[in-house]
Amino acid sequence: MSELSTVARPYAKAAFDFALEQGQLDKWQEMLQFSALVAENEQVVEYITSSLASGQISEIFLQICDDQLDQYGQNFIRVMAENKRLAILPEVFNRFNALRAEYEAIKKVIVVSATELSQAQEEKIAKAMEKRLGQKVRLTTEIDSTLLTGIIIKYDDIVIDGSSRGQLNRLTQALSL
């Protein structure tokens, strides 16, 4: 996976820099998201990994995308097709999002809970994490029915386990020493 990230990085950086310069971060994010979804389609994967000429591949891809891409987005796709890199569009989209989050100083935080959190709970967690991290956060919530109570918070490589399962595991480890 790191190889994909390495190959995708310059494309994502070029798209991000251009979008930032043009003041079109939202538009480019949408275009890349759509292109990434197209590139993940099984039938499209057959075309982009086939032995067709890159010009043919890019034209097929652009026909599928239709009016979802502006002229610059189309040129971006043509360059990627010419370099036989359309298959990495999902990773380019992920890297673009990471660059945007870094630029906007937004930290992605995942909150795992046993049940769906209320809006007030999400806001309270977001405020606490913003205070702890010193930057804005974007919460993504997940539900794990194996948790009895509590939450697990993940960001970067850090996991804060406030679940009852985690507390029981820590207690078991402490007692076994």
Curated annotation (Swiss-Prot):
This is ATP synthase subunit delta. HAMAP family: ATP_synth_delta_bact (MF_01416). PANTHER family: ATP SYNTHASE DELTA CHAIN (PTHR11910). Transmembrane segments: none annotated. Its main location: membrane. F-type ATPases have 2 components, F(1) - the catalytic core - and F(0) - the membrane proton channel. F(1) has five subunits: alpha(3), beta(3), gamma(1), delta(1), epsilon(1). F(0) has three main subunits: a(1), b(2) and c(10-14). The alpha and beta chains form an alternating ring which encloses part of the gamma chain. F(1) is attached to F(0) by a central stalk formed by the gamma and epsilon chains, while a peripheral stalk is formed by the delta and b chains. The gene is atpH. Coiled coil: none annotated. It is found in: Cell inner membrane. The keyword Protease does not apply. InterPro entries: ATP_synth_OSCP/delta_N_sf, ATPase_OSCP/dsu. It comes from the Bacteria. It comes from Haemophilus ducreyi (strain 35000HP / ATCC 700724). Keywords: ATP synthesis, Cell inner membrane, Cell membrane, CF(1), Hydrogen ion transport, Ion transport, Membrane, Transport. SUPFAM superfamilies: N-terminal domain of the delta subunit of the F1F0-ATP synthase. Belongs to the ATPase delta chain family. GO terms for cellular component: plasma membrane; proton-transporting ATP synthase complex. F(1)F(0) ATP synthase produces ATP from ADP in the presence of a proton or sodium gradient. F-type ATPases consist of two structural domains, F(1) containing the extramembraneous catalytic core and F(0) containing the membrane proton channel, linked together by a central stalk and a peripheral stalk. During catalysis, ATP synthesis in the catalytic domain of F(1) is coupled via a rotary mechanism of the central stalk subunits to proton translocation. This protein is part of the stalk that links CF(0) to CF(1). It either transmits conformational changes from CF(0) to CF(1) or is implicated in proton conduction. The keyword rRNA-binding does not apply. NCBIfam families: ATP_synt_delta, PRK05758.2-2, PRK05758.2-5. GO terms for molecular function: proton-transporting ATP synthase activity, rotational mechanism. The lineage of its organism: Bacteria, Pseudomonadati, Pseudomonadota, Gammaproteobacteria, Pasteurellales. It is a peripheral membrane protein. It holds the Pfam family OSCP.
